[in-house]
Amino acid sequence: MEDYKAFLDEKMSKVLLSLDNEYKTLRTGRISSNIFDKIFIQYHGQRTPITQVSSIRIPEARLVVIQPWDKTILNKIEQAILNSDLSMNPSSDGSVIRIKVPALTSERRQDIVKHAKKIAEEHKISTRNIRQDLNNKVKKQEKESEITEDSLKRILDDIQKSTDIYIKKIDAILESKIQEIMEV
């Protein structure tokens, strides 16, 4: 069961990667095309992210230009953005969509921070679930006399230490994201 460390690191690293990907879609003080990653339209009968059917450019700090590759979906993209939780008002000229991005209000920043904390907590729960699953596997091995009681205690301590390290990493990522969100 010495491979438990590699298993644990692999699983918990995936949790950190997932957290990072989730945070890329949160709107902060700086506009990023990543905030459109979770906006979908129906295209050829499939739910498709708008990032896969258009080019998204940010020519100015507060301006986003979305150019669909197929002009027939322009209205679908515009409607999807309006229906999203991004609080943006797109305008189209028939070939491109322009979005003038307003500065985030203090209230909106607080809402985004709450959402970021919720996402972090979900990832902490995932980390703890990984720990629990591995603890159960190790305890089962001890019951089946595959490992000694001393080994069990040592392994459980190692698992807990690794879990604590990853929880601290999640907290550090959260704090960094909060600073980015609150930056004016």
Swiss-Prot record:
Domain of life: Bacteria
KW Thylakoid (keyword) present: no
Compartment(s) where it occurs, according to its Swiss-Prot or TrEMBL record: Cytoplasm
GO cellular component: cytoplasm
Broad class of the protein's primary localization: cytoplasm
Protein keywords: Cytoplasm, Protein biosynthesis
Pfam families according to UniProt: RRF
GO biological process: translational termination
GO MF, one annotated term: ribosomal large subunit binding
InterPro entries with a match to the protein in the record: Ribosome_recyc_fac (IPR002661), Ribosome_recyc_fac_dom (IPR023584), RRF_sf (IPR036191)
Described function: Responsible for the release of ribosomes from messenger RNA at the termination of protein biosynthesis. May increase the efficiency of translation by recycling ribosomes from one round of translation to another.
NCBIfam families: frr
Family affiliation: Belongs to the RRF family.
Name of the protein described by the UniProt record: Ribosome-recycling factor
Source species: Borreliella burgdorferi (strain ZS7) (Borrelia burgdorferi)
